């Protein structure tokens, strides 16, 4: 009886090993399951302070928007729950990379506080990050038209971690409004993610004429 019992356990372990070994990490289904599960934790979250529920040690958010010859960067850092989130808005010349304008920002009690509100609205007219209004999950990605996908394991990666890339043609009205194009028009949209060794690190971007004109990254602070 003992031999029979251990035989069944051994067979079960073998089956599990074979199933794990057969996982196709490069498949669309696997990558969208991974990306959708992770991104849905954040997209969407209207109140930025609520992200502490996902990342108790803190997080950073970065956004870039290219308009004409200017590139606007918005950066916000959250280190401790209950304290103001602090950051900056900067405008750079896209060609020379020279800083043209800069001001500090804070996020307190569910709203932004700007050093110069009038100037901030000119630099950052949408006044919010994408994740505050954009919903992303596995089902939304599965319905989109996939352009390309790529998976890089840690042995081949220059950064030493697993990473993946997905590029779609997709309708995302929230993004279209920021880009100033018709909401029904599909856009080129990309997702770049890392494995759990670095915590939550995801980037999303929208491309126009093969140039990334809107980009956002959320990174978990790990201690």
Q: Which residues does each predicted region cover?
A:
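Sec-dependent bacterial lipoprotein signal peptides
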Residues: 1-22
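N-terminal leader/targeting segments and the immediate start of mature chains
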Residues: 16-64
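Short, exposed beta-strand/loop patches in secreted or surface proteins that constitute
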Residues: 51-53, 74-80, 104-106, 149-159, ...
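Short, hydrophobic/aromatic-rich segments at coil-to-beta transitions
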Residues: 54-62, 83-86, 160-167, 199-202
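Flexible, processing/modification-adjacent segments and terminal tails
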Residues: 108-161
């Amino acid at each position: 009886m003992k031999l029979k019992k251990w035989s069944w356990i051994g067979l079960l372990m073998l089956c599990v090993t074979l199933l794990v070994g057969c996982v196709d990490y490069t498949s669309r289904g696997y990558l969208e399951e991974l990306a959708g599960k992770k991104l849905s934790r954040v997209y969407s979250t209207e109140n930025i302070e609520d992200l502490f529920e996902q990342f108790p040690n803190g997080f950073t958010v970065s956004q870039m928007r290219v308009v004409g010859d200017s590139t606007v960067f918005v950066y916000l850092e959250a280190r401790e729950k209950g304290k103001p989130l602090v950051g900056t808005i900067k405008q750079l010349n896209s060609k020379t990379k020279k800083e043209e304008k800069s001001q500090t920002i804070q996020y307190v009690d569910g709203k932004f506080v700007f050093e110069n509100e009038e100037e901030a609205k000119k630099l950052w007219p949408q006044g919010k990050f994408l994740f505050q209004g954009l919903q992303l999950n596995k089902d939304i990605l599965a319905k989109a038209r996939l352009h390309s996908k790529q998976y890089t394991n840690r042995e081949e990666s220059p950064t030493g971690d697993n990473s993946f890339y997905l590029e779609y043609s997709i309708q995302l009205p929230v993004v279209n409004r920021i880009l100033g194009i018709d909401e029904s028009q599909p856009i080129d949209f990309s997702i770049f993610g890392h494995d759990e060794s670095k915590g939550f690190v995801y980037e999303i971007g929208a491309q126009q004429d093969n140039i990334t004109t809107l980009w956002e990254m959320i990174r978990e602070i790990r201690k």
